Regions:
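Non-catalytic cap/lid and distal C-terminal segments of serine-dependent acyl enzymes
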Residues: 1-150
Length: 150
């Protein structure tokens, strides 16, 4: 395992995609690249949408993970806020984002892509047929591995 930032990366899918970007954006001094597949990247926006809140079968606890969900926007858990801090500090990881057209997080991922493109982020964005499933992730992990080693 390298201690060289340029050879240290993180990747994940679904909530792990959020976790990968969270690690990368929280510690850009350690991680040079962070990749997400089907990531729950805009947690403040997802909380505000009825998609996740109203699902009675959802085992996810916003409060246990992030504290008061009403205070997510702009917090240390908000990837947009972390990105802006990294830009101000002059150290930002390269980002990779992949999502399937049929993924329930597709629209949220489009929003994240659009916001980061406005900020001129070093972002590779991929979308393709597929959903929030292993078939999609298995395809894109190959692409991510190639990207990480560039």
């Amino acid at each position: 395992v390298s201690k060289d930032r340029e050879k240290t990366y993180v990747a994940g899918f679904s909530m792990g995609g959020y976790g990968a970007w969270y690690l990368g954006l929280s510690r850009p001094d350690i991680y040079s690249k962070a990749a997400s597949m089907s990531g729950a990247l805009d947690i403040a926006g997802l909380y505000q949408s009825s998609t996740i809140q109203e699902n009675e079968n959802n085992p996810f606890s916003w409060e246990d993970s992030f504290g008061d969900p009403e205070k997510l926007a702009g917090s240390n858990y908000d990837l947009f806020a972390l990105y802006d801090k990294d830009v101000a500090d002059g150290c930002v990881p390269k980002l990779y984002q992949a999502v399937g057209f049929d993924d329930f997080l597709y629209k949220s991922n489009l929003h994240v892509r659009d916001e980061l493109q406005k900020k001129h982020a070093d972002l590779v964005y991929k979308e393709d047929k597929g959903g929030h499933d292993w078939t999609f992730w298995d395809k894109y992990i190959q692409d991510i591995l190639d990207w990480l080693l560039q």
